[in-house]
Regions:
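Charge-rich, low-complexity N-terminal segments
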Residues: 1-146
Length: 146
């Protein structure tokens, strides 16, 4: 079966709070596990950056459901590619809320023009590398949330 990766960015709707992120995580984990989707959702500075991995059909269907979610606006597709393997296969979904840790801000600055998280300005490759490095920080225990 061919695997695909989809990366998109969106802006949080006004009034989004931490319990909303927990709800997104719980529902995503449950739904994604059933259909073989893996991925990661990062959130900071009112912006979402998410990667989904799985079959083309299931990734497309999942993205279409995400687009109608009222908790975010201005969704924009950054990348949709066939891949050889999953980079985020450990998680049916992981939500990482970006904080002000120096390591996190350093990675943001590495792939952006400022320390403000603005994934809309990232290319597909930059987004993927950002999420990979964020995953490493999480696995090292630097990021301890959601």
């Amino acid at each position: 079966m061919a695997l695909y990766r989809l990366i998109y960015v969106s802006q949080s709707a006004s009034g989004l709070e931490y319990p909303d992120l927990v709800d997104i995580l719980e529902k995503s984990e449950r739904n994604n596990k059933k259909v073989g989707i893996t991925g990661m959702l990062s959130f900071g500075d009112s912006m979402f950056l998410q990667v989904l991995e799985g079959s083309r059909r299931v990734v497309s269907q999942t993205y279409n459901r995400i687009l109608i979610d009222k908790r975010h606006v201005n969704a924009e597709l950054i990348d949709f590619s066939e891949i050889d393997y999953r980079d985020f296969g450990v998680w049916s979904m992981k939500v990482v809320q970006l904080g002000n840790q120096a390591e996190v801000r350093s990675i943001i600055l590495k792939y952006s023009s400022s320390e403000t998280f603005s994934p809309i300005s990232m290319t597909g490759r930059q987004s993927l590398n950002f999420l990979r490095e964020l995953t490493e920080l999480y696995q090292k225990g630097v990021i301890l949330n959601t």
